[in-house]
Amino acid sequence: MGWIPCPCWGTNDDENAGEVADRDPVLLVSGIGGSILHSKKKNSKSEIRVWVRIFLANLAFKQSLWSLYNPKTGYTEPLDDNIEVLVPDDDHGLYAIDILDPSWFVKLCHLTEVYHFHDMIEMLVGCGYKKGTTLFGYGYDFRQSNRIDLLILGLKKKLETAYKRSGGRKVTIISHSMGGLMVSCFMYLHPEAFSKYVNKWITIATPFQGAPGCINDSILTGVQFVEGLESFFFVSRWTMHQLLVECPSIYEMMANPDFKWKKQPEIRVWRKKSENDVDTSVELESFGLIESIDLFNDALKNNELSYGGNKIALPFNFAILDWAAKTREILNKAQLPDGVSFYNIYGVSLNTPFDVCYGTETSPIDDLSEICQTMPEYTYVDGDGTVPAESAAAAQFKAVASVGVSGSHRGLLRDERVFELIQQWLGVEPKKAKRKHLRTHKVVDSG
């Protein structure tokens, strides 16, 4: 595939420079899969969008995003040493988290699955927020660890920018999904900066204690980011799997073993047992949070990918697991500084994967490596379809408000009830509503 220049719609011009902010700025922070990613060859200025894209998705993804974890640095790095992965910062960081595939086809068909923060950005602009003065975005390389310097220092820089551009006003962070975990890591690692720059933190659909069903299955079989007809054009489940096995961020969203779950998450496998070549039986085996590690190891022992004519082994990565365990320690210890208000929105009313089962009684698993080519059966709990409500509601921070909203994991970003809550907590309302209110008020006064 050729390397095609990727024009970015939106700029970082200073059209609002010099304006006096009339409100505290808002910084939108995306979650996993919620940022546009570009790649380019080193010593080249030409970039190609590799996430998200509908057309040629699999090819671009394999070429640029398949990676290997480097235990010496803590980063996951492209298989091709000549490739760099970048996050566009156009439109004050908003471009990368707005419409994740801003191609004409997506806009023409209005594929809402990739309209990420778009509706929320429009809502905030409609309430009087101005890009570059009181509204900013932070997209990042979501393959990386939530506590890695690249991400944490990037967030710090974006907070500093919002603080300065608004005339020294403290920032309201609105984070989605895994973005809430990164904010938690930042809060622990840079408490003074968090206190200096942040006034409020609104988090949406954050897997504070992990997302057991979805993450366990992602490690074993992958994930389908887009469902339905569009998935035919998109990154395949298995192509995605071969990336996620080497992503620290995925391991950091495994179920928290220190959390007191109502019921411990499990992985179940219907196993074929053979005492000799003739007698066989079928048993349902269960693996808890600790035992699942051995299951991951056995299931992924033969996992590999082909890249550039070479076979590359991709077993379960214990170096990433060790790194993720230290991240979990940070997440468990993080504390909200005095003077910062915390608000939590989490999804409810949707069947959400919790326990995962592979094989059936009539079609059992012989060798555990077969799991990776098996579609799972789930046991469901209440949640947003991705994160259990039990996890998303279990922030360890004292909340001004914690509200369950009926909606899907990504759908919450365009949910009217969520918008109402955000407007209430920010103390704003749409301009049209204000004008209507003022006109009514004048009529009353004139009487």
Curated annotation (Swiss-Prot):
Optimum pH is 6.0-6.5. It is found in: Microsome membrane. It is an enzyme of class 3 (hydrolase). The keyword Ribosomal protein does not apply. Changing D384A: Loss of activity. GO terms for cellular component: endoplasmic reticulum; membrane. It catalyses: a 1,2-diacyl-sn-glycero-3-phosphocholine + H2O = a 2-acyl-sn-glycero-3-phosphocholine + a fatty acid + H(+). Optimum temperature is 60 to 65 degrees Celsius. One of its GO terms (molecular function) is O-acyltransferase activity. Unaffected by calcium. This is Phospholipase A(1) LCAT3. It comes from Arabidopsis thaliana.
